[in-house]
């Protein structure tokens, strides 16, 4: 049977990258919101009402996406830490 080796520092780095991507998405969302605000003032009547509904959906989707990236990052980090702790405990049993 072959031995499975994990690169825990790289895995934790990946979790950090994922958290950074969430920040990037949030920043891009803020930039897009500025552009959308300019459009909002130009749309009146039925078009404005339709725009408001679309904007609410967009805002919710952006929040959900950022929240999902944060959740994936923290889950990946927690699982990596748990695996590393388990590996350390098992290695200690064998004098490693």
UniProtKB/Swiss-Prot annotation:
InterPro entries: ESAT-6-like_sf (IPR036689), T7SS_ESAT-6-like (IPR010310)
GO molecular function term, any single one: metal ion binding
Reported impact of residue 77 to A: Still interacts with EsxG, but impairs interaction with host HGS/HRS
Subcellular location: Secreted
Keyword Secreted annotated: yes
Practical application: Contains a number of strongly recognized T-cell epitopes distributed throughout the protein sequence and induces high level of IFN-gamma, indicating this might be a good vaccine candidate. A fusion protein (p846) of 3 well-defined antigens (EspC, EsxH and Rv2660c) induces robust specific T-cell immune response and could be an effective vaccine.
Consequence the record notes for mutating residue 14 to A: No change in activity
CC per GO annotation: cytosol; extracellular region; phagocytic vesicle lumen
Keywords of the record: Metal-binding, Secreted, Virulence, Zinc
Record-listed Zn(2+) binding positions: 14, 70, 76-77
SUPFAM superfamilies: EsxAB dimer-like (SSF140453)
Source species, domain of life: Bacteria
UniProt similarity note: Belongs to the WXG100 family. ESAT-6 subfamily.
Free-text function comment from the UniProt entry: EsxH, in complex with EsxG, disrupts ESCRT function and impairs host phagosome maturation, thereby promoting intracellular bacterial growth. The complex acts by interacting, via EsxH, with the host hepatocyte growth factor-regulated tyrosine kinase substrate (HGS/HRS), a component of the ESCRT machinery.
The protein's assembly and partners: Forms a tight 1:1 complex with EsxG. When it is complexed to EsxG, interacts directly with host HGS/HRS.
Comment field (misc): To improve expression in E.coli the proteins were cloned as a single protein in the order esxH-esxG with a cleavable thrombin tag.
Entry protein name: ESAT-6-like protein EsxH
Designated gene of the protein: esxH
């Amino acid at each position: 049977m072959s031995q499975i080796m994990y690169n825990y520092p790289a895995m934790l780095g990946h979790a950090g990258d994922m958290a950074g991507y969430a920040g990037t998405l949030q920043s891009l969302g803020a930039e897009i919101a500025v552009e959308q605000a300019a459009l909002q003032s130009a749309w009146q009547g039925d078009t404005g009402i339709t725009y408001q509904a679309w904007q609410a959906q967009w805002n919710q989707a952006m929040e959900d996406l950022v929240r999902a990236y944060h959740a994936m990052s923290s889950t990946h980090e927690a699982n990596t830490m748990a695996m590393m702790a388990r590996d350390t405990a098992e290695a200690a049993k064998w004098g490693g």
